[in-house]
Amino acid sequence: MAEKFHILLLNGPNLNLLGTREPDKYGKTTLADIVSELETQAQALNVKFSHLQSNAEHVLIDTIHQARGNTDFILINPAAFTHTSVALRDALLAVSIPFIEIHLSNVHAREPFRHHSYLSDVAVGVICGLGADGYQYALQTAVKRLSTSN
């Protein structure tokens, strides 16, 4: 049976270090563990799922551009680019693909510079502070929104 939707997960800088980087803030779950769980969940939901992690802003932007026309929803943890990247915001707006912004930690309970996001006001929603579970909730929400809009 053909997959209903294509959902793209993008992870920004330093998320390749999950599990070992500041586990008190980000948890002990690795990015590979998160992606594996989402792949299993997506398969059960009959959804095509793809993933990219990059420490390079231009790679994330190029991937967003390439998603135009073949991706129904983007899940993105922009990491530090949340607070700095107008270019990432512009790329997401340019392709008109709905997206959910995800953060493992509660950015509002951290340093003041982390309180501002260049993406939040144009996102479908923002999930923060729920650890790795936030990714699962984002995938479930994306599928539900796509299912009810088609």
UniProtKB/Swiss-Prot annotation:
It comes from the Bacteria. GO terms for biological process: amino acid biosynthetic process; aromatic amino acid family biosynthetic process; chorismate biosynthetic process; quinate catabolic process. Keywords: Amino-acid biosynthesis, Aromatic amino acid biosynthesis, Lyase. Substrate binds at residues 77, 83, 90, 104-105, 114. The active site is at 26 (proton acceptor), 103 (proton donor). Pathway: Metabolic intermediate biosynthesis; chorismate biosynthesis; chorismate from D-erythrose 4-phosphate and phosphoenolpyruvate: step 3/7. One of its GO terms (molecular function) is 3-dehydroquinate dehydratase activity. The record marks 21 as: Transition state stabilizer. Belongs to the type-II 3-dehydroquinase family. The lineage of its organism: Bacteria, Pseudomonadati, Pseudomonadota, Gammaproteobacteria, Enterobacterales. This is 3-dehydroquinate dehydratase. Pfam families: DHquinase_II. Transmembrane segments: none annotated. It catalyses: 3-dehydroquinate = 3-dehydroshikimate + H2O. Homododecamer. The keyword Amino-acid biosynthesis applies. It comes from Pectobacterium carotovorum subsp. carotovorum (strain PC1). Its EC number is 4.2.1.10. Catalyzes a trans-dehydration via an enolate intermediate. Signal peptide: none annotated.
